[in-house]
Amino acid sequence: MLPSHLNGHSPLARRRPRLSAASPPATGDSDAAAAAADAPLAEHDRIYFQSYSHIGIHEAMIKDRVRTDAYRSAIMHHQKFIEGKVVMDVGCGTGILSVFCARAGAKCVYAVEASEMATQAREIVKANNLDDKVVVVHGRVEDVEVEDKVDVIISEWMGYMLLYESMLPSVLFARDKWLKPGGLILPSHATLFMAPITNSERYEGSVDFWSDVYGINMSALVPLAKKFTSEEPSIEIIGGENVLSWPFVVKHIDCYTFKAEELKSITTKYKVSSMMLAPIHGFGLWFEVEFNGPSNPTDKSPSDLNPLDVIRTKRRRGSEDPVVLSTAPEDEPTHWHQTILYFPDPIEVKQDQIIEGSVKVSQSEENPRFLNIQLDCTM
């Protein structure tokens, strides 16, 4: 059993904030907006939202062309549905997605943001002459009161390994409270993948490095290096060549039907076969999201399909297929990178050797925005 934990002291504390409050132009309910902004916050929420007041986080996200282009393409893909409709952007940040929706013809966009970036979002909306369509309200989506129902909910809620930050419950809250029947959620579906990986270069650079440093034997630090390498997940970029097997699905989320309670604990059993002779250094996690309409009850989720079929389907997508944003190792890198769970020591595996076990991802009791990961692996 190889336990790992995601916590606030790791590199994972880098991604962004959201949630908020909004009010349509028709209501002008400034009292509701003020109440939402003044609602008391738990300490972990306060720190979380405060971190997203820093421009650097928003710069990294917007400069991620894979991410930003995918959202813009998805909005244009669904333009006929968005045009003339009411949209809610949950966690709007700088307001870029709200502006995209307004330019696509939305009648009204509620741009909801809990961090202080809401102030700049208002200025951006005004500078683009969209303040008659986009209303930015500063507060958590859970605290705002909006009388009207919305036709579309859009949000860039994904964190490292999809679920870090636990912003998805806020999107689901907005869905249950405001989305009209038959409404659109962007993204509509999300899938977390996992696979064993090999990465000798990284291991040698972090662990074996200490055996000989400028001719000095510093191998006494090797056990410490192994401890720090394996006790927390690492956020880094790997390539398709580092992946030892077809990935398996840890969790598939249909944003139209998923319940927030399901995030408290997710356990998945796996059984994969190594595609090569190589040392296994740990496991990698990544995700993809799809911008589709409501699910067809007869459709299969990725967890019901062979991973090879999922990948082949993705590569065959045409112009009429839903937009997909992928953070897989074989695809163009994004600011999410991949999340790696390293072992203290590599284990040699043969080609076609079976690797099996289970993985449990659960919310931290101390802070539900953080994750605990427990990995069981047998070879």
From Swiss-Prot:
SUPFAM superfamilies, A to Z: S-adenosyl-L-methionine-dependent methyltransferases
Chain intervals with Low complexity compositional bias: 19-35
Binding residue positions for S-adenosyl-L-methionine: H58, R67, G91, E113, E142
Protein name: Probable protein arginine N-methyltransferase 6.1
Family that this chain belongs to: Belongs to the class I-like SAM-binding methyltransferase superfamily. Protein arginine N-methyltransferase family. PRMT6 subfamily.
Domain annotation SAM-dependent MTase PRMT-type: ranges: 45-379
Region (Disordered): 1-35
Xref: CDD domains: AdoMet_MTases
Organism of origin: Oryza sativa subsp. indica (Rice)
GO biological process, one term: methylation
UniProt keyword annotations, A-Z: Methyltransferase, S-adenosyl-L-methionine, Transferase
EC number(s) recorded for this UniProt protein: 2.1.1.-
GO molecular function: histone methyltransferase activity; protein-arginine N-methyltransferase activity
Keyword Acetylation found: no
Transmembrane parts of this sequence: none
